[in-house]
């Protein structure tokens, strides 16, 4: 009798995706982050669902409802902090996942890569709208500043901003629609994840060497299921240490003050995972220029398959490219630090230099170094 998992229409899909999937035998821990992102998404949807049962998307009661969740709901404080810090873990995994793709040349699977970039944009939009919901000071002013950036779009800018706000300022209508979008987007993300996996399974996974691994494949289960479970346990351990020992470590104290349109916080800044983009935005004195730089900082990832000039796919055997890659990582960490600093000397100039370096490394230095390495191969 044939095994049910190989014949049943639904089980067959699961089998081909997670059980009998032929996988390269040498993929390292850097390939764990895909499954960890799946875990993060599941945790966020579940905790978010339970939070939505008690939250009220109204300017008068939103802040109080979050307080009520933390004080009166059974384990409400735990659900709230798992959700808030789960977002941070989500972005850590996302950045490492994208970094892995950049280092090992996974972007040459360009359908998978492009869907991944769309996913990155949608996750960032979801996180931004989620940050507005507690209706604290940073929620309100963050929403005001970021939505206001759209007014830089020529001709339709101001109309567009008022259309998104649902009035002449960030108010009840804005909060209600942000809650609606924040609720629906994770399910759209789930659908996009399926598309992402569909494209990935068309080609099979890349591996650290960047070489074709068809001659050396092993089944996903049990080898990588066990490996993914280890990664999941470590992720949960780190998340729970964060949640139970210092839940507010990555948050902003200003968000414990209810939103007040009449008093601006001294330093408006987003959550830590947006600081690099915020620093790039602030480094350009012109409003429209800043917005374009902000969008370009993520869209630039789309150019990677076009700028890949090396004869080798992975950076595993390319020491000069490795050096440039780690310079890019250091630059992004610098931008993250600058994004959280006030707009004054010397932070302004450091931010501008780091922003220029970010675009230069990706658009000029990495392709140039690839060509040099190609020449060195002929020695």
Curated annotation (Swiss-Prot):
> Belongs to which family?
Belongs to the cytochrome b family.
Q: How does it sit in the membrane?
A: Multi-pass membrane protein
Whose protein is this, by species? Spermophilus atricapillus
- Residues that bind heme b b562: 83, 182
Q: Where does heme b b566 bind?
A: 97, 196
Task: Keywords in alphabetical order, please.
Answer: Electron transport, Heme, Iron, Membrane, Metal-binding, Mitochondrion, Mitochondrion inner membrane, Respiratory chain, Transmembrane, Transmembrane helix, Transport, Ubiquinone
Where in the sequence is the signal peptide annotated?
A: none
Task: Write out the residues that bind a ubiquinone.
Answer: 201
What's the further remark here? Heme 1 (or BL or b562) is low-potential and absorbs at about 562 nm, and heme 2 (or BH or b566) is high-potential and absorbs at about 566 nm.
The free-text cofactor remark is: Binds 2 heme b groups non-covalently.
* InterPro entries in UniProt: Cyt_b/b6_C, Cyt_b/b6_C_sf, Cyt_b/b6_N, Cytb/b6-like_sf, Cytochrome_b, Cytochrome_b_C_euk/bac, Cytochrome_b_N_euk/bac, Di-haem_cyt_TM
Q: Where in the cell is it found?
A: Mitochondrion inner membrane
Question: What's an example of a GO molecular-function annotation for this chain?
Answer: metal ion binding
- This chain belongs to the protein called Cytochrome b
Which GO BP terms apply?
Answer: mitochondrial electron transport, ubiquinol to cytochrome c
Q: Which Pfam families match?
A: Cytochrom_B_C, Cytochrome_B
**Main role?**
Component of the ubiquinol-cytochrome c reductase complex (complex III or cytochrome b-c1 complex) that is part of the mitochondrial respiratory chain. The b-c1 complex mediates electron transfer from ubiquinol to cytochrome c. Contributes to the generation of a proton gradient across the mitochondrial membrane that is then used for ATP synthesis.
The gene from which this protein is expressed is: MT-CYB
* Residue stretches spanning the membrane: 33-53, 77-98, 113-133, 178-198, 226-246, 288-308, 320-340, 347-367
Q: Which domain of life is it from?
A: Eukaryota
Q: Which GO terms describe its cellular component?
A: mitochondrial inner membrane; respiratory chain complex III
